[in-house]
């Protein structure tokens, strides 16, 4: 997201630097969590594939290094190196998502849907983060253009809708591999946590992002930032 929006709009150097440093902080936390909590061999009775587990933290470490270099290029205004570094970070980040998807793809009916689900979920997180951060930047300087916020909000809304469609399709499909116990055979749609995932995780964010988009179009950056 940092690569896409920085290429499309004239974003301030301070904003780009803050965004890259924030992502680096999140990556460091993710690396620590993965190292301290290895992925189990099964989740809720369904087997996981942990053969490529060690490559996930390695890819995150590589991504952290590339983003650190990008932050240095932004700070020193080395414009010629910013785009290649951002592109490399996007490729390594996508690789990390694909590795994570491969770990949980065994019980999934379609590995493609699982990978798309993770990709769109990551795009939602990235779009919302960039928009929220730009909203805070706008509050410190009202002269900034509203177009980046409108595009970021619209992008997040579209990804949320596509993410929801994939979740609905995936929930209707059976597991491709049998679970280890009969408890895991319970109907998914009878579980409260499933509907919490749909309501709190999808329907509410779509409504909030739709309101944020309309607020951004009329210049209500404070409302947009709060909703996101």
Identify the role of each PLM range:
Residues 137, 141-145, 175-189:
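Membrane-interface interhelical connector segments
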Residues 1-140, 148-168, 195-228:
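Polytopic transmembrane helical bundles with strong interfacial aromatic enrichment
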């Amino acid at each position: 997201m940092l690569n896409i929006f920085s290429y499309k709009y004239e974003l301030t150097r301070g904003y780009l630097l803050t965004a890259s440093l924030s992502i680096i902080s999140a990556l460091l936390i993710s690396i620590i969590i993965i190292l301290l909590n290895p992925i189990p061999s099964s989740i809720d009775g369904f087997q996981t594939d942990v053969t490529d587990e060690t490559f996930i933290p390695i890819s995150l470490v590589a991504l952290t290094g590339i983003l650190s270099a990008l932050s240095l290029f932004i700070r020193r205004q080395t414009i010629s190196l910013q785009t290649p570094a951002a592109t490399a970070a996007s490729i390594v980040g996508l690789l990390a998502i694909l590795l994570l998807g491969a770990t949980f793809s065994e019980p999934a009916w379609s590995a493609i849907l699982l990978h798309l689900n993770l990709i769109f979920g990551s795009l939602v997180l990235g779009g919302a983060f960039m928009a929220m951060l730009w909203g805070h930047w706008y509050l410190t300087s009202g002269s900034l253009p509203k177009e980046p916020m409108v595009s970021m909000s619209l992008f997040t809304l579209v990804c949320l809708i596509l993410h929801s469609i994939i979740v609905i399709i995936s929930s209707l499909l059976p597991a491709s591999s049998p679970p280890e116990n009969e408890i895991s055979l319970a109907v998914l749609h009878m579980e409260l946590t499933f509907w919490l995932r749909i309501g709190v995780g999808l329907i509410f964010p779509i409504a909030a992002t739709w309101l944020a988009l309309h607020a951004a179009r009329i210049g209500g950056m404070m409302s947009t930032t709060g909703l996101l």
